[in-house]
């Protein structure tokens, strides 16, 4: 009986160890996103996915040559956004003009992660709808 219990415990420990790596890799923020140099981009919302575990904003913005580029910005989950900023599924709608400040993917792709320090404002009114810069201005 003791041997069977010990074997079960060892099997559980091995399985937990095996899934820990992918879990940490999934949430490996610093390796992929440039926190030291917040990026500012202004664009037009195409889609807002207010879901768990991660919400997302799909938007278009002009690149340096003036061509429209599709962007993806990942946020925290719907529950966290609602608690922190009172967001709902209607907070952003297709056609809304937004300004985003936050970490861009280090590989230069049009991908941002806004689940840490970031700011989102409505471009037309300047109204800030999200700010997680912890009482400091971007880049400080």
Where are these regions (language model features)?
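Short boundary/loop segments of OB/S1/cold-shock single-stranded nucleic-acid-binding domains
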Residues: 24-39
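Conserved hydrophobic positions within beta-strands
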Residues: 41-45
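Short, basic/aromatic beta-hairpin or loop at an interaction surface
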Residues: 67-79
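Short aromatic-glycine-enriched beta-strand elements
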Residues: 51-62
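N-terminal secretory signal peptides that target proteins for export/translocation
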Residues: 1-5
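Bacterial N-terminal signal peptides
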Residues: 8-22
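Short nucleic-acid-contacting surface segments enriched for D/E, G, S/T with interspersed K/R
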Residues: 83-100
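OB-fold/S1-family single-stranded nucleic acid-binding modules
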Residues: 105-134
């Amino acid at each position: 009986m003791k041997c069977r219990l010990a074997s079960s415990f060892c099997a559980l420990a091995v399985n937990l160890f095996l899934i820990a790596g992918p879990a940490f890799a999934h949430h490996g923020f610093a390796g992929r996103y440039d926190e030291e140099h917040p990026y500012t981009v202004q664009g037009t919302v195409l889609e807002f996915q207010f879901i768990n575990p991660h919400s997302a904003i799909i938007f278009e913005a002009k690149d340096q040559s003036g061509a429209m580029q599709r962007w993806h910005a990942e946020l925290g989950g719907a529950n966290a956004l609602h608690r922190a900023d009172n967001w709902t599924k209607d907070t952003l709608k297709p056609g809304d003009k937004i300004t985003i400040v936050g970490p861009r993917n280090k590989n230069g792709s049009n991908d941002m992660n806004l689940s840490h320090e970031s700011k989102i404002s409505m471009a037309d009114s300047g109204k800030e709808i999200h700010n997680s810069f912890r009482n400091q201005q971007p880049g400080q």
